[in-house]
């Protein structure tokens, strides 16, 4: 009987810690998508710059003298495969993750659901504590 209670307590503790929150937040998903887009941006710079207007003489002169500071930003084509891809969309709300500010996509848990979750977790911890104390005392 005590072994049965210990197994139930271990399962309850595992469920509590597993349900305490996602391993990766929506904010991290957005920033990772942005970081990946910027990495692929640098790799496929020529394919994106193909639709940009040609450099003027002064811009060419500047780019020769100040290669690091005056680099033109690539033309951003959002129908390019690196942007228009199912992985760049939010799994539930389905809006694109290539927005300039990832803070738009931060998932805010409501106070009511947070309060309910805290009460449930406190109840589970109380039940596990009493099961363990009954098993060992």
Curated annotation (Swiss-Prot):
Residues 1-18 form the signal peptide. Residues 40-65 are annotated as: Disordered. A motif (RxLR-dEER) lies at residues 32-61. It is found in: Secreted; Host cytoplasm; Host nucleus; Membrane. Its main location: secreted. Keywords: Host cytoplasm, Host nucleus, Membrane, Secreted, Signal, Transmembrane, Transmembrane helix, Virulence. The chain crosses the membrane at residues 114-134. Induction: Expression is up-regulated at later stages of infection. GO terms for cellular component: extracellular region; host cell cytoplasm; host cell nucleus; membrane. It is a single-pass membrane protein. Belongs to the RxLR effector family. Effector that partially suppresses the tobacco programmed cell death induced by cell death-inducing proteins. The RxLR-dEER motif acts to carry the protein into the host cell cytoplasm through binding to cell surface phosphatidylinositol-3-phosphate. This is Secreted RxLR effector protein 67. The lineage of its organism: Eukaryota, Sar, Stramenopiles, Oomycota, Peronosporales.
